[in-house]
């Protein structure tokens, strides 16, 4: 059995991690994509319009992009084929239904705790010291916690690694991370807080070179994105899928909750709660006055996410969907990508080349419609209607 866990494009290569016969593999592939151009002969390949096309390989990925750039605007000359080269690579190498072993996929749930000397930590400056990092292995259930102060550990399923300071914490964490090499990391609000803060703070303390050790390929990228009118920071760690369990929960449970705080979701779904620390006036008082309880608080957070997955199986669903569509795990959040991959593979099996992608002006904006949030509940005499209007010229 051979299956991938992540495929990442870097220049002209596809960087692939996965498992073969139970053992981890890691490969760098020089990839030569296949495109299709109109043909006058019966080549065995057609378009959706029933026109003959023939396959060509202009060269590596960079040459294919240059070929697109050069000929896409030529009138009457259409270039067919999948231009997402990761999807094309996966389809080329996994043409049959993908068989996979969930027990081999290394899934971590992760949570961090940070100083709050100046209020809630900010991922854009990462000015506050990292105090704790906890990780739970989903398959073994073992928890490893890195902390900067002594802790009285009384649990056999927890390994507490006491660190001299923050620099020592990051160094020991990186050693563990490289040795264990997770395939998929999850957590609650992980994508917009825990991972960006680890990356930002580590870069500030250890430098960019050391931070790149987070990726098995040495590639860590950060970008700003806008969500609900707010600018957020998002990190990409090449070779590792970062799946926010909060986003999974919102997308695949099909329920509306009055709050999406982990404490509320854990209570609703599991009948469990985060560790209460209301006896302290501030979060700073919490970690300065009762370190042992503070560590337990951090550990419980990774356990709650792990138990949510045990019950809901949303990561399992995500993995199944990705392999069915032949995509990366993170692509399940993007409906267009998923349908692109599904359609491409369906047509490929029938020797039909996917049509060329229409080039649009991304700067052109269109007025959007107001979307009213529905009120969940049972209703009688429901009507479904659609209204449209056209501006009078």
Over which residues does each language-model region extend?
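Non-catalytic nucleic-acid-binding interfaces of large nucleic-acid enzymes and RNP effectors
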Residues: 1-83, 204-236, 276-277, 294, ...
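Conserved RNase H-like, two-metal-ion catalytic cores of nucleic-acid enzymes
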Residues: 3-9, 14-46, 86, 93-184
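Extended, Lys/Arg-enriched charged tracts that mediate electrostatic binding to polyanionic substrates
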Residues: 99-118, 214-235, 344-362
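Active-site-proximal helix-loop-helix substrate-binding element of RNase H-like nuclease domains
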Residues: 143-145, 152-160, 164, 181, ...
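Short glycine-rich phosphate-binding loop at a beta-alpha junction
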Residues: 182-190, 321
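Short active-site loop/helix that positions an aromatic residue
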Residues: 194-204, 388-392
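Common nucleic-acid-contacting/processivity interface regions adjacent to the catalytic cores
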Residues: 281-384, 388-392
